[in-house]
């Protein structure tokens, strides 16, 4: 693996979707860190997150979507209203989020979370 910044950027921009999913990991809150013995976990729709940086800092909300193409997360609390009344979500980078509650209805995700790291 190269150390060159241009090759690192190229790898990020040209990564396939199944590999982008792992880079969409969000840090766990302190109590979740203790419970699951891991620092971060890939985010998905249905998780609850807290925004720790940016204009929406301190806002908690459910994840409404994950944009793998642009490496962004859409959070329910970080939205504005358009003129016609519809919601416009502000895309947020996963590094600016902390996972507060994990959506565990998915069995494979449950196994991945409890797997030894």
Swiss-Prot record:
Q: Does the keyword Ribonucleoprotein feature in the UniProt annotation?
A: yes
Q: Which UniProt keywords apply?
A: Ribonucleoprotein, Ribosomal protein, RNA-binding, rRNA-binding
**SMART domains with a match to the protein in the record:** KOW (SM00739)
Q: Name one GO cellular component term.
A: large ribosomal subunit
Q: Which InterPro entries does the UniProt entry name for this protein?
A: KOW, Rib_uL2_dom2, Ribosomal_uL24_CS, Ribosomal_uL24_euk/arc, Ribosomal_uL24_KOW, Translation_prot_SH3-like_sf
Give GO BP annotations, semicolon-separated.
translation
Span list, region Disordered: 1-28
Presence of the UniProt keyword RNA-binding in the record? yes
Name a Pfam family for this protein. KOW
User: Tell me, what is one Gene Ontology molecular-function annotation carried by this entry?
Assistant: structural constituent of ribosome
Superkingdom of origin: Archaea
Q: Where is the composition biased (Basic residues)?
A: 1-10
Q: Assembly state and interactors?
A: Part of the 50S ribosomal subunit.
Give the family this protein belongs to, as stated in its UniProt record.
Belongs to the universal ribosomal protein uL24 family.
Q: What does this protein do?
A: One of two assembly initiator proteins, it binds directly to the 5'-end of the 23S rRNA, where it nucleates assembly of the 50S subunit.
PANTHER family on file: 60S RIBOSOMAL PROTEIN L26 FAMILY MEMBER
Protein name, please? Large ribosomal subunit protein uL24
List the gene name.
Answer: rpl24
